[in-house]
């Protein structure tokens, strides 16, 4: 029986060597403990700091500006050294950012979609250099890799909470928008077949716009966006199609005024929901920060009280009055002291008079309010005797 168990175990191992490696590696990796907690905490504080975010936003923005200058051949020729230096600086900054984030949390870093977007952008950065080294400068598709460098501006998404909120809203509307687009496609399919049969006849039909299904779909898309629909309708009127105007008006009403507005409405609804959720999360974060600050203050107060109690326990004084007397003996003639007759000082008298003025103003306003309340109540009492006989008359009539 032990041999059979050993054979079965060996058969499983031999069938999946990758699983065996992962099974052996995971416990070892879980038991692994890093000894650089202080350094990692410092790097994390640097990454989460406001100054670091400002540096990254400024770097990405300046690189986008230099890329706009790079599109001009004259500027590229005259500022070649500056553009090359800015390129090297930007690539080094982005690579350093990636290295720092992976160093802080090498496992959870890959679970964030925006971090994966940064990795893809860095791969796109190195793509032109790799193609020039491997395929040469005359490679056919090298211009595509150069054009993809415009994706660098997407690094700003990770540093803008507002943009992330909008992207979340767009992601939540995928299924609803897909349903709306499917309905619009079905509507266009029905009208494309109908338009091909009505206006795409071989004899006197409009072959450019309705000659086949693909042309009919493209024409209907122009009608749905209400782009040049008058020119399309004029071509149908020139061929004297009887139902052309009814066809065009009905499709524009359904496609443009209903489905496209429905699409916009769905986007607005989900965007508002995402904004409300973002505001709630921001409020919770502010409350957590406030509670954290309060906890720090309370902890400091507790430590101070504990320190004072410890000092009092270790003191030689038997009572508080004795402690005060001993404290007075340590005073010199140059030490500042708070006088007991604070109520007779000029600042206190000034504040006291101002408080009395505020109190008189408040009493005066309250009296005016009471007068208005009494006046309203008197008017209500005057109306009550007039309503009472009417109710009695109704009772008598019954």
Curated annotation (Swiss-Prot):
Ranges facing Cytoplasmic side: 1-48, 108, 161-168, 269-398
GO-annotated biological processes: establishment of localization in cell; flagellated sperm motility; sodium ion transport; sperm capacitation
Keyword Membrane: yes
Pfam families: Ion_trans
Entry keyword Ion transport: yes
Any one GO cellular component localisation term in the record: endoplasmic reticulum
Residue numbers on the Extracellular membrane side: 72-80, 132-143, 196-216, 237-242
Tissue and organ expression note: Testis-specific.
Subcellular location: Cell projection, Cilium, Flagellum membrane
Transmembrane segments: 49-71, 81-107, 109-131, 144-160, 169-195, 243-268
Keywords, ordered alphabetically: Calcium, Calcium channel, Calcium transport, Cell membrane, Cell projection, Cilium, Developmental protein, Differentiation, Flagellum, Ion channel, Ion transport, Membrane, Spermatogenesis, Transmembrane, Transmembrane helix, Transport, Voltage-gated channel
InterPro entries from the UniProt entry: Ion_trans_dom (IPR005821), Volt_channel_dom_sf (IPR027359)
Intramembrane segments: 217-236
Subunit: Component of the CatSper complex or CatSpermasome composed of the core pore-forming members CATSPER1, CATSPER2, CATSPER3 and CATSPER4 as well as auxiliary members CATSPERB, CATSPERG, CATSPERD, CATSPERE, CATSPERZ, C2CD6/CATSPERT, TMEM249, TMEM262 and EFCAB9. HSPA1 may be an additional auxiliary complex member. The core complex members CATSPER1, CATSPER2, CATSPER3 and CATSPER4 form a heterotetrameric channel.
Family membership noted in the UniProt record: Belongs to the cation channel sperm-associated (TC 1.A.1.19) family.
Purpose: Pore-forming subunit of the CatSper complex, a sperm-specific voltage-gated calcium channel that plays a central role in calcium-dependent physiological responses essential for successful fertilization, such as sperm hyperactivation, acrosome reaction and chemotaxis towards the oocyte.
Protein's name according to its UniProt entry: Cation channel sperm-associated protein 3
Organism: Homo sapiens
């Amino acid at each position: 029986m032990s041999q059979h168990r050993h054979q079965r175990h060996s058969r499983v191992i031999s069938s999946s060597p990758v699983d065996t490696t992962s099974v052996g590696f995971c416990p070892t990796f879980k038991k692994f403990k890093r000894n650089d907690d202080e350094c990692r905490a410092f790097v994390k504080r640097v990454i989460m700091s406001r100054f670091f975010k400002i540096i990254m936003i400024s770097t990405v923005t300046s690189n986008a500006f230099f890329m706009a200058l790079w599109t001009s051949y004259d500027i590229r020729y005259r500022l070649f050294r500056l553009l090359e230096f800015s390129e090297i600086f930007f690539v080094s900054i982005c690579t350093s950012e990636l290295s720092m984030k992976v160093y802080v949390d090498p496992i959870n870093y890959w679970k964030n979609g925006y971090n994966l977007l940064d990795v893809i952008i860095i791969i796109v950065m190195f793509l032109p250099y790799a193609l020039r080294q491997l395929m040469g400068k005359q490679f056919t598709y090298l211009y595509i890799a150069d054009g993809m460098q415009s994706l660098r501006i997407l690094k700003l998404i990770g540093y803008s909470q507002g943009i992330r909120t909008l992207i979340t809203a767009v992601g939540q509307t995928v299924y609803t928008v897909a349903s709306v687009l499917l309905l619009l496609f079905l509507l266009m399919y029905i009208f494309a077949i109908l338009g091909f049969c009505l206006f795409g006849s071989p004899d006197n039909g409009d072959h450019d716009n309705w000659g086949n299904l693909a042309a009919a779909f493209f024409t209907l898309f122009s009608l749905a966006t209400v782009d040049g629909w008058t020119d399309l309708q004029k071509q149908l009127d020139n061929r004297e199609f009887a139902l052309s105007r009814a066809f065009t008006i009905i499709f524009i009403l359904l496609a443009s005024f209903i489905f496209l507005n429905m699409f916009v409405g769905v986007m607005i609804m989900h965007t508002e929901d995402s904004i409300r959720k973002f505001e709630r999360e921001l409020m919770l974060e502010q409350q957590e920060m406030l509670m954290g600050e309060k906890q720090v203050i309370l902890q400091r107060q507790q430590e101070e009280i504990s320190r004072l109690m410890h000092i009092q326990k270790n003191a030689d004084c038997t009572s508080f009055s004795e402690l005060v007397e001993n404290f007075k003996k340590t005073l010199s003639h140059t030490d500042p002291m708070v006088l007991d007759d604070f109520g007779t000082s000029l600042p206190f008298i000034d504040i006291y008079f101002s408080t009395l003025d505020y109190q008189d103003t408040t009493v005066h306003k309250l009296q005016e309010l009471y007068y208005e309340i009494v006046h309203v109540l008197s008017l209500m009492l005057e109306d009550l005797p007039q309503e009472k006989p009417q109710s009695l008359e109704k009772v008598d009539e019954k």
